[in-house]
Amino acid sequence: MNNWNSITIKISREAGEAISALLIEAGSAGVEINDSADYLNHEDQFGEVLPEIEQSDFVEITAYYPENMPIVELKAEIEHKIANLSDYFSLTGLSVTTNNLSETNWAEAWKKYFEPARITHDLTIVPSWTEDYVATGSEKLIRLDPGMAFGTGTHPTTKMSLYALEQVLRGGETLLDVGTGSGVLSVAASYLGAAEIFAYDIDEVAVRVALENIELNPGHEKIHVSANNLLEGIDKKADVIVANILADILVLMTEDAFRLVKEEGYLIMSGIIADKADMVIASAEKAGFFLETRMIQGEWNCLIFKKTENREGVIGG
């Protein structure tokens, strides 16, 4: 019998991915995210009976830690780190609670909740331990270990990023993946024909996770992963830059992105809550980009900008 402590955080949905990363960094063996939007936005394709869920602006994130870790001190440390993030998102309604539980082989049992998920017409995310799933037709399998960090790749912001990559990649491109997290976007770009991919993350844990996930997939030799703060100090010119991170962070990189994107190239920005989309658009347009496509799923936005002198077909052009 394995004993575990859990820390559950209730916080605004916008902060969910950042808090998940923080909990993993603090040593969590796994993170569970309970989000009502996952049910409300779910497309019933297989006759599933889903529970009645009331819309909420909050998510509950539960992280699991071995019992021998000092949970009281750990809770205090996590609360301190969350407080330091108040400049980036609202902490209104925040709650942090702890619990003790016993579970036989918990580290394996949680895996039953993650199943293969068809994300786009051609891309399906498959847990690394699912060996019997066979691709059909043009389907390409992205293998991930979602227990390592950063979820399963099925969040609306990730889905829209994948759709955006399908829209702009034609083959042979150089791509920069900023805030790579699980590495899912880099793997997808490889499948979609990008010739050279550079993935960056400021978090060393994310760099390790991305490397491990990328190596689960074919074509990993053309993906280069390293620690870096956004695009600071990067000189590599790219046909496409993609970033799925917080809106307040995205606006810090628009000028560097414009410097690095080749003429007629694209900047894909996702992870944007609806009420901050205009802020991101203004920042990118000020840098010199034109908004070409705006995708919306629920309260999330994904924006595709183009660096071009020809405004025909561009929003506002």
Curated annotation (Swiss-Prot):
SUPFAM superfamilies: S-adenosyl-L-methionine-dependent methyltransferases
Main location: cytoplasm
Descriptive protein name: Ribosomal protein L11 methyltransferase
Family under the similarity heading: Belongs to the methyltransferase superfamily. PrmA family.
GO BP annotations, alphabetical order: methylation
Subcellular location per the Swiss-Prot or TrEMBL entry: Cytoplasm
NCBIfam families in UniProt: prmA
InterPro entries: Ribosomal_L11_MeTrfase_PrmA, Ribosomal_PrmA_MeTrfase, SAM-dependent_MTases_sf
This enzyme's EC code(s): 2.1.1.-
Catalytic activities: L-lysyl-[protein] + 3 S-adenosyl-L-methionine = N(6),N(6),N(6)-trimethyl-L-lysyl-[protein] + 3 S-adenosyl-L-homocysteine + 3 H(+)
